Each structure stands twice: as structure tokens, then as C-alpha cells.
């Protein structure tokens, strides 16, 4: 059980991210760092810090098109360390310009989405899957809830995020379910003695509905002007 923490923030800056800039491979690149500190549990599919665990920060880093490094987790960890992020965290990467991220909020839940959709398609494709990590193109979704969720609810929240993403893509006229490298990170407060731990985060639960709406709006706002195919 974590140490006693201040009441969760439900104001407009729950996901208060810092935009960082660096030059790498001759390109000017950006990264978004959210560093809320202790007291957060995250469920993520990210290459760095994925799974379910307490995490202290989330980094969403832009990398160059044609990225060829074979150690993305180490690369992300080095970037986070250089930015002053201590402890363990979550690292996502994308070739999209993360400084153009879209944000949305609903009832205390917040979502930040960066989107690059040049390589997109349907999840159930007849093509054989490749081995290893795919090239970063990617819709990256980071969402935060000001309440505690059980492990099952965190997994449920990732499902809700994915469903809301696909809904937004279809409503935008895009004939796809996403890109092959999409990543998700859902953050919720760590459980405290005597505080409620929510067991559900599906799209018809109280907090899941808020999560779905915030992600849906953020994905819609993040999509570049691309002709449907």
C-alpha cells in the first residue's frame, strides 16, 4: 500500500506535460514528459515500462522517420534521464510531431493523443505479422483518471481506450482500426487505505464512460488532414 497522498487533482491540468526539444540525427524533435511523481499505477503497452505497475512518469518521444535503432527502450530511458525524470516510468515513441498533440477532458478524466496514420490498416489483416518492433508511425494515447482502479479495471480501461480510438477513426472517414504500432498508457491513482478502488472501467461504467469520451475527442482532434482510403 502506498504512502498517504494528497487528494487527487480533478482540475484542468491533471496531465500537465512538459514539451521538450532536442536535435537528433539532424532533425529537430520533440517529446512530451508527464512527471506526476509517486502515487500512480499505470497499465501500458509501451516498449519501456509496459505492463501494470506504479510508475512516476510518462515520456512520449518523437523520433526521426526511418528510425533504425534496435534498442528503443534504452533510447527512451536515456531521453527521460536527460530530462530529469527519476524512478521508473513509461516510454512511448512515434514519428509524429508530438508538439501537435490533442487534449480532451471529461469529468476529471484527461487524454492526450498524438497521431501519425500514414501506415494504417485493420487489425485482422490477412497479411502475416512481422517479428520484432515495427517502425514508429503510431497513435499514442496517454490517459489519466483521478481515482484508483483494480488491475482488472486497468485492463478494462485499455480496452475502452482502444474502442474509443477505433470509433473516432471510423467517424473521421478512415477505413482502419489503427496503425500497427499504436500504444496506450492509462494512469490511475494508487489505492489508499480506506479509499474506494473501482472495479470497472468499461464504456458504460462511470469512469470508463468519461475515459471513452475524452479519448474519443482527443483522437478526433489529433488526426491530420488525410484523405480517406
Stretch-by-stretch model annotation:
Residues 1-229:
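Alpha/propeptide regions of enzymes that mature by internal proteolysis
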Amino acid at each position: 500500500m502506498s504512502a498517504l497522498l494528497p487528494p487527487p487533482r480533478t482540475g484542468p491540468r491533471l496531465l500537465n506535460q512538459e514539451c521538450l526539444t532536442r536535435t537528433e540525427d539532424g532533425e529537430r524533435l520533440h517529446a512530451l514528459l508527464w512527471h506526476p511523481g509517486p502515487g500512480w499505477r499505470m497499465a501500458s503497452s509501451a516498449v519501456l515500462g509496459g505492463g501494470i505497475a506504479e510508475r512516476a512518469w510518462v515520456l512520449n518521444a518523437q523520433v526521426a522517420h526511418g528510425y533504425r535503432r534496435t534498442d528503443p527502450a534504452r533510447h527512451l530511458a536515456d531521453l527521460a534521464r536527460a530530462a530529469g525524470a527519476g524512478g521508473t516510468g513509461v516510454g512511448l515513441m512515434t514519428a509524429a510531431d508530438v508538439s501537435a498533440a490533442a487534449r480532451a477532458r471529461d469529468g476529471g478524466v484527461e487524454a492526450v493523443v498524438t497521431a501519425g496514420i500514414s501506415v494504417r490498416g485493420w487489425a485482422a489483416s490477412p497479411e502475416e505479422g512481422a517479428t520484432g518492433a515495427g517502425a514508429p508511425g503510431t497513435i499514442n494515447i496517454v490517459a489519466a483518471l483521478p481515482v484508483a482502479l483494480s488491475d482488472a479495471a486497468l485492463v478494462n480501461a485499455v480496452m475502452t481506450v482502444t474502442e474509443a480510438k477505433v470509433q473516432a477513426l471510423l467517424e473521421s472517414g478512415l477505413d482502419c482500426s489503427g496503425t500497427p504500432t499504436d500504444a496506450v498508457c492509462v494512469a490511475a491513482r494508487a489505492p489508499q487505505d480506506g479509499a474506494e478502488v473501482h472495479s470497472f472501467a468499461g464504456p458504460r461504467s462511470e469512469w470508463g464512460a468519461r475515459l471513452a469520451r475524452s479519448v474519443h475527442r482527443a483522437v478526433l482532434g489529433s488526426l491530420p488532414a488525410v484523405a480517406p482510403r
